């Protein structure tokens, strides 16, 4: 049972549009958008790639868990999570208990296109050679976790962030009277 429905969490793979949709949700609701990866970078003063290089994935996931714990204590926020946030059971529990969880999906081709457009080929878990295979691997592992957490699911291949954000808010209001 959810304790708090005032937060909206966006989960899904890299390139699904979490930050783009989150930005529109924040504008429409007059809430603050947090991007967990950007918040980690702000707190540490280092970019995610550097953290992965110096501390490995385990070090990054520890920092991510601490950041999620801090952000989940806030009220009335929009949070765009990192794609791997679902790998940690504590993250899944905190997110599920403190807000509405929106799972944004995207095809591998859409993800590749968006990641390439943003110049994000340097993402730590994104291997430029075999990038399609790497995304498929990550999706196979993470998809069941995303699905288990999701309150609402939206495909974003034909994404118009503003229209999707508007639809999400309509659906949330129809589903949950607390928001």
From Swiss-Prot:
Q: Which UniProt keywords apply?
A: Amino-acid biosynthesis, Aromatic amino acid biosynthesis, ATP-binding, Cytoplasm, Kinase, Magnesium, Metal-binding, Nucleotide-binding, Transferase
UniProt main location, coarse: cytoplasm
What's a Pfam family this protein contains? SKI
Domain of life per record: Bacteria
Q: What EC number(s) is this enzyme filed under?
A: 2.7.1.71
Reactions catalysed? shikimate + ATP = 3-phosphoshikimate + ADP + H(+)
One cellular-component annotation, GO: cytosol
Q: Which gene encodes it?
A: aroK
Molecular functions (GO terms): ATP binding; magnesium ion binding; shikimate kinase activity
Known function: Catalyzes the specific phosphorylation of the 3-hydroxyl group of shikimic acid using ATP as a cosubstrate.
> What does the record say about how the cofactor binds?
Binds 1 Mg(2+) ion per subunit.
GO process terms (BP): amino acid biosynthetic process; aromatic amino acid family biosynthetic process; chorismate biosynthetic process
Compartment(s): Cytoplasm
What is the protein name given in its UniProt record?
Shikimate kinase
**Which pathway does it take part in?**
Metabolic intermediate biosynthesis; chorismate biosynthesis; chorismate from D-erythrose 4-phosphate and phosphoenolpyruvate: step 5/7
Record family assignment:
Belongs to the shikimate kinase family.
Tell me which cofactor or cofactors this protein depends on: Mg(2+)
Quote the record's binding site residues for ATP: 15-20, 122
Q: Does the keyword Nucleotide-binding apply?
A: yes
Describe its partners and assembly state: Monomer.
Q: Which HAMAP family match?
A: Shikimate_kinase
Residues at which substrate binds: 37, 61, 83, 142
Q: Which residues bind Mg(2+)?
A: 19
